[in-house]
A protein has these predicted regions:
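FAD-site-proximal beta/loop scaffold in flavoenzymes
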Residues: 64, 75-91, 180-226, 232, ...
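A Rossmann-like FAD-binding core segment of flavoenzymes
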Residues: 13-39, 43-46, 52, 115-201, ...
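Glycine-rich active-site loop/strand segments that organize a redox cofactor
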Residues: 1-12
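FAD-binding core/adjacent interface of flavoenzyme oxidoreductases
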Residues: 26-95, 202-206, 210
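Cofactor-binding loop segments of dinucleotide-utilizing enzymes, especially the Rossmann-like FAD-
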Residues: 86, 102, 125-127, 220
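Rossmann-like NAD(P)H-binding beta-loop-alpha module
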Residues: 95-116
Length: 253
């Protein structure tokens, strides 16, 4: 809310500016290489070799997206090809779109994208992921499914124009959605011994507590899906309350 259309780097700059006003906050623009238990605390080591000690650790490192290895896809990702219909579907409404998906989520993703465009082409990039019943449902909606392998996405200045298949066939498209593989952006949750859920997220309670005392997780690292900024921010707020509550209880012992 209040930040519709803002670029991620602009949002990040605003957040840093607001946080910097608090004297108790020290922001370090460094990469952490390891986190380990040290008696009743944790030792955090950075890429530069600096060592920090902390009573608690909040993992909010998010996810990394692994895109299908299709030539040109990275050139259009985040510009005219996106992963989240709820984030960018409105901006692509009524255009001829492609849905690139190689897994069991394909049918669901197509149904969601249908809310914004009825001119859809489904590309499974050489994978057979749809049942006959699902194919028939899509056919009745006028949605074509192409299982041939994609070799390239072509366009100009980030705007997708056409798809190229291994058969040399081409299809015109003006945008679309892709289902990337989502992985933890950092290994710290697993390295610290946190329980992971079936989606690869860190298991937490309602206040961000993991199964390891003193370790908390928030945002996409614990939720995995839906991966949205406003949800991640809310999870961060709840985890912060959990950290504060537990530190307060310890201080009164």
């Amino acid at each position: 809310m209040t930040r519709d259309g803002v670029k991620p780097y602009e949002f990040r700059a605003i957040a840093h500016q607001e946080i910097s006003k608090y004297p108790s906050v020290d922001m370090q623009q460094v990469r952490v290489t390891s986190i380990r238990h040290a008696d009743a605390s944790f030792e955090i080591t950075t890429e530069q070799g600096d060592l920090f000690s902390a009573k608690t650790v909040l993992l909010a490192t998010g996810l990394k997206e692994i895109l299908p290895p299709i030539e040109g896809l990275h050139d259009y990702y985040g510009k005219s090809v996106f992963c989240c219909p709820y984030c960018d579907g409105w901006e692509l409404r009524d255009r001829p779109l492609v849905v690139i998906s190689e897994g069991p989520q394909t049918f669901h993703l197509v149904k969601v994208v249908w809310n914004w465009s009825h001119d859809l082409l489904v590309c499974t990039n050489g994978h057979q992921v749809l049942t006959e019943e699902q194919r028939e449902t899509l056919r009745k909606k006028g949605i074509e499914v192409v299982e041939d392998r994609l070799t390239a996405l072509v366009g100009k200045q980030g705007q997708l124009e056409r798809m190229v298949f291994a058969t040399q066939e081409e299809r015109a498209r003006r945008g679309g959605f892709v289902a990337p593989q989502l992985l933890q952006a950092s290994p710290f949750g697993e390295e610290l011994g946190c329980e992971m859920n079936a989606m690869g997220g860190i298991v937490t309670d309602s206040f961000g507590r993991t199964t390891v005392p003193g370790v908390y997780a928030a945002g996409d690292a614990s939720l995995v899906v839906p991966a949205q900024l406003i949800i991640a921010a809310a999870e961060g707020s709840r985890a912060a309350a959990g950290v504060n509550t537990d530190l307060t209880e310890r201080a009164f012992l």
